[in-house]
């Protein structure tokens, strides 16, 4: 457990050191906003394609750490492409290569962690909280550091931290792949034929759309509502801080009341937060609502990873995790970024959050229905066996 906790602490420390500042670095470098937008769209599209492929490859290897190690080594090296090159064509190439490995590392980490945790007897949430802790700490420190050292230093910090991540990976127990290896076609077939898993993805996509839109457009919401933009950083920090204890709480709740009820609670928290932003004109109430945001994210992130594992077989664990991440986070981010901007331009920011409320409350109801269907199925099987 200590090696996993160290891994998540360092992994999200690295993410916090690089990802929030990469677009800002490109802007400081003189890259136009139009091209930056194109590069970000290309990153998102690449992640949707890369994650399932890397997951399928991971499930076929004898040691499930290998692909993750490869991602840990190549991601910081490829990130330097943005540091050394200015040509548009070169930036486009690195906008495919870098996110191919960077985006895959997150879902592969979760797949490995939940597998180790299930065998060692601890929950995913109790490990993931260390990532939330390091990310929240880094959120306060990195901006101050980069103002002094320059934004070009983000790549060196990312490389240095990833060296630590790689060292910790060698401490992980060697997880062998299933002896029953499937072809990539059969792996894809297992995903497509699993109707319960596909329904679960559909419900989670409603929540992830809300997460993606809120993350991208919260600063614009502040601007359109006339709030002091100096509070924007504080809103993200509040959510990040509350995530730490809430990941611990989610681990307890997952084992006590079940994952689907926890997911229902997460969707309900998001719904209340979005409804608040749709109608309030008080910036302090918006700041307070971020407590719900951080709570919802911790509940949602911890429960979904464990739910996805329950749908998969031993030979397709990484495949299911990466497909889930590609669709809900990757595709959800693309759709959310596109339609969020359109809704704000035509209907205004409060109306956007009213739509997000509808999405989240719909997801909460669907999680309740799924829970009741699951309970009936378990009761029916119990009666048949007895």
Label for each model-derived stretch:
Residues 9, 78-79, 88-106, 205, ...:
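Hydrophobic core of transmembrane alpha-helices in multi-pass small-molecule transporters
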Residues 1-44, 197-235, 301:
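Helix-loop boundary and gating motifs at the non-cytosolic
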Residues 49-63, 146-147, 245-258, 344-345:
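Helix-to-loop junctions at the C-terminal end of transmembrane segments
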Residues 66-80, 159, 261-276, 357:
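Structural signature of the two symmetry-related core transmembrane helices
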Residues 26-27, 57-58, 129, 144-149, ...:
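Interfacial helix-cap and linker-helix signal at transmembrane-aqueous boundaries
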Residues 144-160, 341-360:
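A membrane-interface helix-boundary motif in multi-pass transporters
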Residues 96-130:
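Cytoplasmic helix-loop-helix junction between adjacent transmembrane helices
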């Amino acid at each position: 457990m200590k090696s996993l906790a160290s891994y998540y602490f360092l992994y999200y420390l690295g993410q916090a050191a690089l990802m929030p500042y990469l677009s800002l670095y490109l802007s400081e470098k003189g890259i136009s906003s139009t091209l930056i937008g194109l590069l970000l769209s290309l990153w998102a599209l690449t992640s949707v394609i890369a994650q399932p492929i890397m997951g399928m490859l991971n499930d076929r290897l004898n040691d499930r750490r290998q692909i993750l190690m490869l991602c840990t080594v190549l991601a910081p090296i490829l990130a330097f492409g943005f540091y050394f090159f200015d040509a548009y064509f070169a930036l486009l190439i690195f906008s495919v290569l870098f996110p191919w490995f960077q985006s895959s590392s997150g879902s592969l980490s979760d797949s490995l962690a939940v597998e180790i945790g299930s065998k060692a007897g601890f929950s995913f949430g109790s490990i993931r909280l260390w990532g939330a802790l390091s990310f929240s700490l880094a959120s306060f420190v990195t901006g101050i550091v980069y103002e002094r050292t320059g934004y070009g230093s983000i790549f060196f910090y990312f490389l240095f931290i990833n060296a630590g991540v790689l060292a910790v990976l060698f401490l992980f127990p060697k997880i062998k792949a299933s002896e029953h290896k499937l072809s990539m076609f059969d792996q894809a077939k297992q995903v497509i034929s699993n109707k319960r898993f596909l329904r679960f993805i559909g419900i989670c996509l409603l929540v992830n759309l809300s997460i993606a839109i809120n993350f991208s457009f919260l600063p614009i919401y502040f601007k359109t509502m006339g709030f002091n933009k100096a509070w924007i950083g504080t809103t993200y920090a509040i959510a990040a801080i509350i995530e730490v204890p809430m990941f611990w709480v989610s681990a307890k709740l997952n084992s006590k009341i079940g994952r689907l009820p926890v997911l229902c609670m997460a969707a309900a928290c998001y719904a209340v937060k979005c409804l608040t932003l749709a109608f309030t004109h008080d910036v302090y109430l918006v700041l307070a609502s971020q407590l719900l945001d951080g709570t919802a994210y911790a509940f949602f992130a911890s429960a979904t990873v464990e739910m996805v594992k329950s749908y998969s077989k031993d030979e397709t664990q990484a495949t299911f995790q990466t497909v889930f991440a590609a669709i809900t986070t990757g595709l959800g981010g693309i759709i959310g970024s596109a339609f969020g901007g359109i809704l704000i331009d035509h209907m205004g920011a409060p109306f956007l959050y009213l739509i997000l409320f509808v999405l989240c409350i719909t997801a909460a109801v669907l999680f309740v229905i799924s829970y009741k269907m699951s309970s009936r199925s378990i009761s029916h099987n119990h009666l048949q066996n007895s």
